[in-house]
Amino acid sequence: MILWKSLSCFSFVFGLLLYSASFVCAGDIVHHDDSLPQRPGCNNNFVLVKVPTRVNGSEYTEYVGVGARFGPTLESKEKHATLIKLAIADPPDCCSTPKNKLTGEVILVHRGKCSFTTKTKVAEAAGASAILIINNSTDLFKMVCEKGENVLDITIPVVMLPVDAGRSLENIVKSNAIVTLQLYSPKRPAVDVAEVFLWLMAVGTILCASYWSAWTVREEAIEQDKLLKDGSDELLQLSTTSSRGVVEVTVISAILFVVVASCFLIMLYKLMSFWFIEVLVVLFCIGGVEGLQTCLVSLLSCFRWFRRFGESYVKVPFLGAVSYLTLAICPFCIAFAVFWAVKRQYSYAWIGQDILGISLIITVLQIVRVPNLKVGFVLLSCAFMYDIFWVFVSKWWFRESVMIVVARGDRSGEDGIPMLLKIPRMFDPWGGYSIIGFGDIILPGLLVTFALRYDWLANKRLKSGYFLGTMSAYGLGLLITYIALNLMDGHGQPALLYIVPFILGTLFVLGHKRGDLKTLWTTGEPDRPCPHVRLQPQSS
């Protein structure tokens, strides 16, 4: 069907262009920024700070701020943080000695024109136990020391709040209410169960897609052998039909992928906004509907109750021949995608996003094929360099990681682009999500599905084939990605940096050891005996 093929190609390009690195999407709570000045007394890491408040003794709101490069470190547990009364500075910027007397209160000040260290020293000299600085915008600014300043004598914590949080507290205090608060910076757990589930989700997606792809190819091969044995004229028609919905990656397209994907990523980076995210949501819904419909139709067709509807077709204007089963399932898929798009800001929306995403990935891995190891090597090598460049190297040109900024949607006011699988971090005091980009599943998955197709066509057992090795290599590479993620305090990691060497290395080593490397590299299919040979009588 023409529409199905065009949507399949769209799904492939869409899935590849919009993939991102694997990283925790809660906002890094620890920033090791070596580009900003450090010296004794001014070498703290930038950490996010929780500020739970009480108004007249009742729990109110919890705000989030950021700590300064200087001053003492904060407690990591709420039970150890002291509940302290909040006071407003007079003058508001605290650049000169406050008129009001302080006896251990936390002082709320405006950013003003003097340095952060100056106002901190003034507040400390006036008797403040901590200082909250209201920023001029909703962003959190990194508070550093000025050149030549002596900060060794600063002994009170310094925290910056966004302007909306600061003004809210200021208005409450001005209304003569008694505001008390705590300051603490909880640490993230070394491992969150969300990462385990995300690992299982990624591995399971490739596993399902691989067996579906291999089963389809084997059925085509069996049917082809049967027609060839019978000498049927339907052989040519079968070859044309079987390849109609398949997109084969070539060396040229693998190389062009890096160029096109890089241009698209820069466009996303420059044009990122609320409305641009809305466009991406619409595109994701289109791909998700196609993927979910394809998966459901194929799954239900395995049951005899639905098989008859899946094999009966009706002509639909502009669409061509469509099965009755597809017509019945399509409205449900559209309704599901629309429901997710409308409710995507809710806490449970990640479930719908993952269902649509997994369906899209499985469909792409079913219709897109790597013909041989040579193409797979070029594709993964290009993606390997692409991932590293846009996660790490781009920081030197753009002063921030382009890949991570795009994936998190930092400039859009949204939670990030929808082309991600994500699971909420269940035991993380900061919340957020563990996420993985589509490309970190699709690109390695293309080579894993290729390995299983080769094994089935060559009648190899699981232990003697290549699928078990490549599948294990992917799982191990992804596991090391999460280890690196935790070692780097949640900073974004290019998953392909760890996955690609494992997968390619496994295929090359096993192929060389078993003598199949030349076949894997060139044809990508094992030599199979012609059915006619078995039918020829032996000459006496």
From Swiss-Prot:
<dbReference type="InterPro" id="IPR003137">
    <property type="entry name" value="PA_domain"/>
</dbReference>
<dbReference type="InterPro" id="IPR006639">
    <property type="entry name" value="Preselin/SPP"/>
</dbReference>
<protein>
    <recommendedName>
        <fullName>Signal peptide peptidase-like 4</fullName>
        <ecNumber>3.4.23.-</ecNumber>
    </recommendedName>
</protein>
<feature type="transmembrane region" description="Helical">
    <location>
        <begin position="322"/>
        <end position="342"/>
    </location>
</feature>
<dbReference type="InterPro" id="IPR046450">
    <property type="entry name" value="PA_dom_sf"/>
</dbReference>
<keyword id="KW-0967">Endosome</keyword>
<feature type="transmembrane region" description="Helical">
    <location>
        <begin position="196"/>
        <end position="216"/>
    </location>
</feature>
<feature type="active site">
    <location>
        <position position="387"/>
    </location>
</feature>
<comment type="similarity">
    <text>Belongs to the peptidase A22B family.</text>
</comment>
<feature type="transmembrane region" description="Helical">
    <location>
        <begin position="271"/>
        <end position="291"/>
    </location>
</feature>
<feature type="glycosylation site" description="N-linked (GlcNAc...) asparagine">
    <location>
        <position position="135"/>
    </location>
</feature>
<feature type="topological domain" description="Cytoplasmic">
    <location>
        <begin position="369"/>
        <end position="372"/>
    </location>
</feature>
<keyword id="KW-0472">Membrane</keyword>
<feature type="short sequence motif" description="PAL">
    <location>
        <begin position="494"/>
        <end position="496"/>
    </location>
</feature>
<feature type="glycosylation site" description="N-linked (GlcNAc...) asparagine">
    <location>
        <position position="136"/>
    </location>
</feature>
<dbReference type="Pfam" id="PF02225">
    <property type="entry name" value="PA"/>
</dbReference>
<keyword id="KW-0325">Glycoprotein</keyword>
<feature type="topological domain" description="Lumenal">
    <location>
        <begin position="486"/>
        <end position="489"/>
    </location>
</feature>
<keyword id="KW-0378">Hydrolase</keyword>
<feature type="domain" description="PA">
    <location>
        <begin position="89"/>
        <end position="170"/>
    </location>
</feature>
<feature type="transmembrane region" description="Helical">
    <location>
        <begin position="348"/>
        <end position="368"/>
    </location>
</feature>
<dbReference type="GO" id="GO:0006508">
    <property type="term" value="P:proteolysis"/>
</dbReference>
<feature type="transmembrane region" description="Helical">
    <location>
        <begin position="249"/>
        <end position="269"/>
    </location>
</feature>
<feature type="transmembrane region" description="Helical">
    <location>
        <begin position="465"/>
        <end position="485"/>
    </location>
</feature>
<comment type="function">
    <text>Intramembrane-cleaving aspartic protease (I-CLiP) that cleaves type II membrane signal peptides in the hydrophobic plane of the membrane.</text>
</comment>
<dbReference type="InterPro" id="IPR007369">
    <property type="entry name" value="Peptidase_A22B_SPP"/>
</dbReference>
<feature type="signal peptide">
    <location>
        <begin position="1"/>
        <end position="26"/>
    </location>
</feature>
<feature type="glycosylation site" description="N-linked (GlcNAc...) asparagine">
    <location>
        <position position="56"/>
    </location>
</feature>
<dbReference type="Pfam" id="PF04258">
    <property type="entry name" value="Peptidase_A22B"/>
</dbReference>
<feature type="topological domain" description="Lumenal">
    <location>
        <begin position="394"/>
        <end position="431"/>
    </location>
</feature>
<keyword id="KW-0645">Protease</keyword>
<keyword id="KW-0812">Transmembrane</keyword>
<dbReference type="GO" id="GO:0010008">
    <property type="term" value="C:endosome membrane"/>
</dbReference>
<feature type="transmembrane region" description="Helical">
    <location>
        <begin position="432"/>
        <end position="452"/>
    </location>
</feature>
<keyword id="KW-0732">Signal</keyword>
<feature type="topological domain" description="Cytoplasmic">
    <location>
        <begin position="217"/>
        <end position="248"/>
    </location>
</feature>
<keyword id="KW-1133">Transmembrane helix</keyword>
<feature type="topological domain" description="Cytoplasmic">
    <location>
        <begin position="292"/>
        <end position="321"/>
    </location>
</feature>
<feature type="topological domain" description="Lumenal">
    <location>
        <begin position="27"/>
        <end position="195"/>
    </location>
</feature>
<feature type="topological domain" description="Cytoplasmic">
    <location>
        <begin position="511"/>
        <end position="540"/>
    </location>
</feature>
<feature type="active site">
    <location>
        <position position="440"/>
    </location>
</feature>
<feature type="topological domain" description="Cytoplasmic">
    <location>
        <begin position="453"/>
        <end position="464"/>
    </location>
</feature>
